């Protein structure tokens, strides 16, 4: 991937969109994971360039930990927020999430309750992001990549909801490529705070942080995102998966892709052509 070209395209597109629509801030949920770190870096450059031409713009990052948030990931979110964002805030939503969750229903399995609470946390974060967007005259920027979009790794009305996303059609393995490119830039710039933040983000295994399951790759059973992306590309292109890939991993990826197809086709509506008016 030509990281320089991809980065420049993303920055220029965002600059044009935000300026032409008179939007003066980007609101970003900063988790400490690779996706939000990469999006933060993209918008740091957008902010820098827009402000240099006299257009007031800022990237506002917010970390919203709960009791299930990985301590390392939260620590990294602080590194990213303080070194890359123009403004950074922390809001613990633990008690808020617990206060609005319906008590365990009789006969309901424990894993169902974990999913419910996890979804509440994700949707609460989105409520706060959109509230901040209103307060600061901005919009919410997303962190969804193509791999996780196809596999359904998002909560409907939660992290799957946003107004603008520069990495939606980047494979997860490409997000890592871009992060390493950013790392090289900051090493050359001797901005060691950003080097530290980006390198730490690259090193932490992706996970939702909702208290539902282990890391994403462990859940899939895949060794790395190159494997996952290659399988998904084969599915989309209707071509054979490389023979050296484990059959269980292939089945796991394809099963997640098929089972989450409904998320990629929402909302379901009835067209006017179906009615006899």
PLM features per residue range, with description:
Residues 1-28, 38, 42-45, 49-120, ...:
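ATP/NTP-dependent adenylation/nucleotidyl-transfer catalytic domains that generate, transfer
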Residues 33:
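Conserved G/P- and acidic residue-centered "switch" motifs that form tight phosphate/ATP-binding loops
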């Amino acid at each position: 991937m030509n990281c320089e070209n991809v980065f420049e395209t993303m920055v220029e597109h965002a600059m044009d969109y935000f300026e032409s629509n008179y939007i003066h801030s980007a609101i970003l949920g900063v988790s400490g994971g690779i996706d939000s770190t990469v999006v933060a870096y993209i918008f740091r450059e957008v902010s820098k360039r827009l402000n240099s031409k006299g257009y007031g713009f800022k990237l506002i990052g917010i970390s919203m930990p709960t009791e299930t948030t990985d301590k390392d990931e939260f620590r990294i979110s602080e590194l990213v927020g303080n070194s890359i964002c123009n403004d950074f805030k922390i809001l613990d939503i633990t008690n808020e999430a617990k206060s609005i969750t319906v008590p365990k229903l009789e006969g309901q399995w424990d894993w169902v309750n974990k999913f419910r609470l996890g979804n509440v946390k994700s949707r609460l974060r989105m409520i706060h992001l959109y509230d901040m967007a209103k307060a600061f005259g901005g919009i919410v920027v997303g962190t969804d990549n193509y791999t996780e979009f196809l596999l359904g790794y998002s909560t409907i009305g939660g992290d799957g909801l946003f107004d603008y996303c520069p990495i939606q059609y980047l494979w997860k393995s490409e997000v890592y490529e871009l992060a390493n490119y950013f790392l090289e830039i900051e090493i050359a710039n001797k901005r060691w705070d950003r080097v530290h933040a980006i390198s730490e983000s690259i090193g932490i295994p992706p996970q939702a942080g909702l208290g539902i399951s282990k890391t994403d790759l462990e859940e899939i059973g895949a060794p790395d995102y190159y494997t996952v992306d290659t399988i998904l590309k084969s599915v989309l292109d209707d071509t054979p998966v490389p023979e050296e890939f484990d059959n269980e991993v292939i089945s796991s990826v394809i099963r997640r892709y098929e089972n989450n197809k409904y998320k990629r086709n929402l909302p379901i509506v009835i067209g006017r052509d179906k009615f006899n008016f």
